[in-house]
């Protein structure tokens, strides 16, 4: 059964799907839930995990959402992101290795929502154009473009949940000489196939996960050399002999790149692994989240409630150690807030802002990686404790992350060959049948082969 309340969810990626599953879970227990409408601009669910060969614009002229590439494997252990209510073993019928390729993770994400039967709540190929809030009626007007029928229309909702992600709008810096660079210049968002760079000398600009993984992919598929450059600190791993880290890029002159230490090098391609922006071009200033990519997002009470309009929620806007299970914790909490099981009416704006400040202060208390992982783990625990989301061993998930960091430090090109224990089933993952550097086929069939 549904109440008269209407809820709009923006996006059917992992966060939006978590929200659909949360409402479906309540409905399955006999609770009355609001009418749910999820708008998704792509023709399928999965968000970033819904791979496309396209770059730039999609078939409808919308900016391509996908930032994933062929041969992408999870860069963190699956034991840190497993759904508490749907294990990898339940989905695949057996335990699988700890670092699955993209296609395997997409299949896992899809399996849970197929089981929950929530697809009818999603309007695919429907891009959100604008959202307004009317103070007099207390309703949001959501204007969308239905590409299937080439129709623009508006509907009203009591609540809006923004689950559109923040890893699809690239941050593209400019360096002197880019205009006359003679090689390939591409942002990680548009990187699709490492084989393109086989036999080439490449420069990777950046020192975070994209730089680490895209550089590693290019190494695996035969790049002649990799140079990566950093603005603040090197990644500092034990790189292969043909990979060197340099300080900040200063300028480019044709195919020569110059660094802040006075050195230079000839390269055939430059890959910008320079991050992404929180970008919401469908929201006015009074509804639009403005935050850096951090663990304690600005202006979000409990990390999800928009303090300037508590009828609006944001999911998954944090920098992330935990992913799918954190999105679940947030989605269950938002569901209960909307359904009145968590009472926001007596929380003042001042109290919400104080909550945000307290979270920021705690985040900034240390720059230690283990501290950051535990910080986000405590956040997940906090939300889970306030809802009926299935409890799971969050500390055990932290241990998987700690081991992952240790294994990366030991051998950055072999860390995916390790295995960890599921915190949901207690089963140790098998070691994958082929070492990562030799596993050139990333298909699900090849991965699941015994």
UniProtKB/Swiss-Prot annotation:
A Pfam family the protein falls into: FMO-like
Names of required cofactors: FAD
One GO molecular-function entry: flavin adenine dinucleotide binding
Binding-site list for FAD: 15, 40, 42, 48-49, 65, 75, 128, 320, 323
EC number(s) given by UniProt: 1.14.13.148
First-level EC class: oxidoreductase
Organism domain of life: Bacteria
Residues involved in NADP(+) binding: 73, 75, 175, 207-208, 210, 231, 416
Catalytic activity: trimethylamine + NADPH + O2 = trimethylamine N-oxide + NADP(+) + H2O
The entry's keywords: FAD, Flavoprotein, Monooxygenase, NADP, Oxidoreductase
Role of this protein: Catalyzes the oxidation of trimethylamine (TMA) to produce trimethylamine N-oxide (TMAO). In vitro, has a broad substrate specificity, oxidizing many nitrogen- and sulfur-containing compounds, including dimethylamine (DMA), dimethylsulfide (DMS) and dimethylsulfoxide (DMSO).
Family of this protein: Belongs to the FMO family.
Listed name of the protein: Trimethylamine monooxygenase
Organism this protein belongs to: Ruegeria pomeroyi (strain ATCC 700808 / DSM 15171 / DSS-3) (Silicibacter pomeroyi)
Gene this chain is encoded by: tmm
């Amino acid at each position: 059964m549904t109440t008269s309340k209407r809820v709009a969810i923006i996006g059917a990626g992992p966060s939006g799907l978590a929200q659909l599953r949360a409402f479906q879970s309540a409905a399955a227990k006999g609770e009355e839930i609001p009418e749910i409408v999820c708008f998704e601009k792509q023709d399928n669910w999965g968000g970033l995990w819904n791979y496309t060969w396209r770059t730039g614009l999609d078939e409808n002229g919308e900016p391509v959402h996908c930032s994933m590439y062929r041969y992408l494997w999870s860069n963190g252990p699956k034991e840190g992101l497993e759904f508490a209510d749907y294990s990898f073993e339940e989905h695949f019928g057996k335990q699988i290795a700890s670092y699955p390729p993209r296609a395997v993770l997409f299949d896992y994400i899809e399996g849970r929502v197929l089981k929950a039967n929530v697809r009818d709540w999603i309007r695919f190929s429907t891009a959100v154009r604008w959202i307004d809030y009317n103070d007099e009626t207390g309703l949001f007007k959501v204007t969308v473009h239905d590409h299937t029928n080439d129709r623009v229309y508006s509907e009203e909702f009591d609540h809006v949940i923004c689950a559109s992600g923040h890893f699809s709008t690239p941050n593209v810096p400019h360096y002197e000489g880019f205009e006359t660079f003679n090689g390939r210049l591409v942002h990680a968002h548009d990187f699709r196939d490492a084989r393109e760079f086989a036999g080439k000398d490449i420069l990777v600009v950046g020192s975070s996960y994209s730089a680490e993984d895209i550089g590693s992919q290019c190494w695996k598929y035969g790049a002649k050399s990799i140079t990566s450059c950093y603005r603040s600190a090197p990644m500092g791993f034990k790189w292969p002999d043909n990979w060197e880290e340099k300080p900040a890029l200063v300028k480019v002159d044709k195919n020569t790149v110059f660094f802040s230490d006075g050195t230079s090098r000839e390269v055939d391609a430059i890959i910008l692994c320079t991050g992404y922006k929180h970008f919401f071009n469908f929201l006015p200033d009074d509804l639009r989240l403005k935050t850096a990519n951090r663990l304690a997002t600005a202006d979000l009470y409990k990390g999800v409630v928009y303090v300037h309009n508590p009828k609006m929620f944001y999911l998954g806007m944090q920098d992330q150690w935990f992913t799918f299970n954190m999105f679940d914790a947030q989605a269950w909490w938002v569901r209960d807030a909307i359904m009145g099981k968590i009472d926001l009416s007596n929380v003042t704006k001042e109290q919400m802002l104080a909550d945000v400040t307290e979270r920021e202060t705690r985040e900034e208390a240390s720059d230690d990686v283990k501290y950051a992982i535990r910080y986000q783990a405590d956040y997940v625990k906090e939300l889970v404790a306030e809802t009926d989301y299935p409890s799971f061993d969050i500390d055990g998930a932290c241990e998987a992350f700690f081991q992952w960091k240790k294994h990366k430090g030991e051998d950055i090109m072999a860390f995916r060959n390790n295995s960890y224990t599921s915190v949901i089933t207690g089963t140790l993952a098998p070691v994958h049948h082929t070492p990562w550097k030799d596993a050139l086929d990333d298909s699900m069939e090849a991965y699941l082969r015994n």
